[in-house]
């Protein structure tokens, strides 16, 4: 096994901050996430990392929740990539179109290269009943898709999941093809899990599984959303679901990911599992 990684980066999933009372039934402690983020940044700032990515659900609800959580991120010395989850759209309807900009994203879906690896951020909220106001064509299309999934008896036919549209899928397909032509390995990141089958999975996620298998260069898909975490392998792709930071009163969870030519090493902190994933 090679001893030096191609690059290292940090992972945080589902801080889901809000100035709200805990939800004891689900073991979620919304206010405590600021202190957990600060603790995580204290550790991550001491590491040599290319960047830190947060896999969605920075907030639980309310536009004003973004202020304290984004202020906490100013304490992170590394480059930060944020993406929305379903809860980040639990804001007033007139604010829905501002969420990506509030998170400082260049676009709802985008890609970048670090250390010879292509990183791709997808937006599984695009087709959802919460990301566009009622009465809009995008909301109506999402409602129709959810109704079709309910009629099929799909286990992920939930209002708190979402999917991607044809334009985004075509962009993803083209991005993977360009990376393959350039000889780049790819890591795709999104909020919603794709595999193994689970009630939290992206609507129509099977299309992405097939695409990744055809492409053959997607070494990993990283996500949050399912707070208990999960792990699977399909084709040559590892599917890693990181645990939710908002869960439990005091225990934290975050990770450092190391990419090697022959493996992925995940160094888990707190409740997050450490893993060695051979490529």
Please name every model-derived segment:
Residues 32-36, 200-216:
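Short, motif-level signal for alpha-helix interfacial/capping segments enriched in acidic residues
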Residues 49, 183-184:
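Short, high-confidence coil segments that cap the C-terminus of an alpha-helix
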Residues 27, 56-59, 158-162, 196:
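Second-shell loop/turn segments in exported
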Residues 63-182, 207-217, 232-267, 278:
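Extended active-site neighborhood of metal-dependent phosphoesterases/phosphodiesterases
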Residues 23-25, 64-65, 198-202, 278-279:
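Short, solvent-exposed loop/turn segments at secondary-structure boundaries
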Residues 15-18, 58-61, 86-90, 125-128, ...:
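Solvent-exposed loop/turn segments at secondary-structure junctions
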Residues 1-67, 167:
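N-terminal active-site segment of His-dependent metallophosphoesterases
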Residues 11-13, 52-57, 80-86, 122, ...:
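Active-site neighborhood of phospho(di)ester-bond hydrolases with catalytic His/Asp-centered motifs
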């Amino acid at each position: 096994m090679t001893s030096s990684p191609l690059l290292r980066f940090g992972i945080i999933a589902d801080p889901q901050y809000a100035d709200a009372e805990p939800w004891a039934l689900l073991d979620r402690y919304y206010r405590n996430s600021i202190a957990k983020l600060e603790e995580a940044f204290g550790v991550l700032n001491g590491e040599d990392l290319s960047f830190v990515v947060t896999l969605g659900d920075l907030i639980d609800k309310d536009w004003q929740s973004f202020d304290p959580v984004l202020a906490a991120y100013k304490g992170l010395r590394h480059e930060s990539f944020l993406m929305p989850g379903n809860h980040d759209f639990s804001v007033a309807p007139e604010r829905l179109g501002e969420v990506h900009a509030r998170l400082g994203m260049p676009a709802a879906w985008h890609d970048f290269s670090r250390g010879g690896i292509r990183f791709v951020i997808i937006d599984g909220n695009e087709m959802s009943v919460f990301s566009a106001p009622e009465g809009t064509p995008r909301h109506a299309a999402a409602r129709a898709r959810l109704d079709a999934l309910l009629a099929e008896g799909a286990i992920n036919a939930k209002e708190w999941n979402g999917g991607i549209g044809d334009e985004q899928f075509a962009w993803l397909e083209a991005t993977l093809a360009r990376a393959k032509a350039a000889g780049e390995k790819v890591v795709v990141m999104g909020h919603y899990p794709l595999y193994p089958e689970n009630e939290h999975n992206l609507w129509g996620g099977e299309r992405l599984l097939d695409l990744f298998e055809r492409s053959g260069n997607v070494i990993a898909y990283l996500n949050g959303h399912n707070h208990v975490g999960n792990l699977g392998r399909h084709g040559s792709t590892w599917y890693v679901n990181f645990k939710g930071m908002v869960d439990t009163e005091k225990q934290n969870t975050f990770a450092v990911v190391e990419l090697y030519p022959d493996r992925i090493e995940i160094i888990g902190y707190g409740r997050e599992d450490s893993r060695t994933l051979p490529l």
